[in-house]
């Protein structure tokens, strides 16, 4: 494989992994432990 192909596959899989991880953090079981600063300061 050419270097550009390997590099583009690596970068796209890295971005996909970061996206999947951030969705898991936002909506997964860990999301119950996240604090909401807007709810803390509502009046």
UniProtKB/Swiss-Prot annotation:
GO BP annotations listed: photosynthesis
GO CC annotation terms, alphabetical: chloroplast thylakoid membrane
Acyltransferase in keyword set: no
Transmembrane segments: 5-25
Subcellular location: Plastid, Chloroplast thylakoid membrane
Record membrane topology: Single-pass membrane protein
Summary of the function given for this chain in its UniProt record: May play a role in photosystem I and II biogenesis.
Name of protein: Protein PsbN
């Amino acid at each position: 494989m050419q270097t550009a192909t390997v590099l583009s596959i690596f970068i796209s899989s890295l971005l996909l992994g970061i996206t999947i991880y951030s969705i898991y953090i936002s909506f997964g079981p860990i999301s119950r432990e996240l604090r909401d600063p807007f709810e803390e300061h509502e009046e």
